[in-house]
Amino acid sequence: MTRYEYLLSCLVLRLSEMNGVSVRIISKDMYLCRALSFSYTNIGKNAELLNHFAKIAKENELTIKTCFVGKSQRLANSDKEWYKKNELENEDFFPDMTIDIDKIKIPKEICEKP
């Protein structure tokens, strides 16, 4: 398993279940960057996955930058309730998360190609 395949399994597969945020994965490898970028909606149902990302980030001393981008007219009531519950401002904006996979620490044996 290569380093990127490991990242795919521990991060991107989680993203496939997550339909609440726009997630931008950045890397020096621009082809990889494009391949691993996903966008989602309906954040209200996915607080657990956001917490999971926070845990991965902390374990890897990685900063997940969260900002609000792009006004959306499609906010469902559940989304508004989630923002209210979590005391976030700008409920009309979806968050954007940026993950720099080049900064994630990967076990040496996983970095090596099979």
Where does each model-flagged region fall?
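Acidic helix/loop or adjacent segment enriched in Glu/Asp that either coordinates divalent metal
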Residues: 1-27
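C-terminal functional segments of enzyme domains
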Residues: 18-114
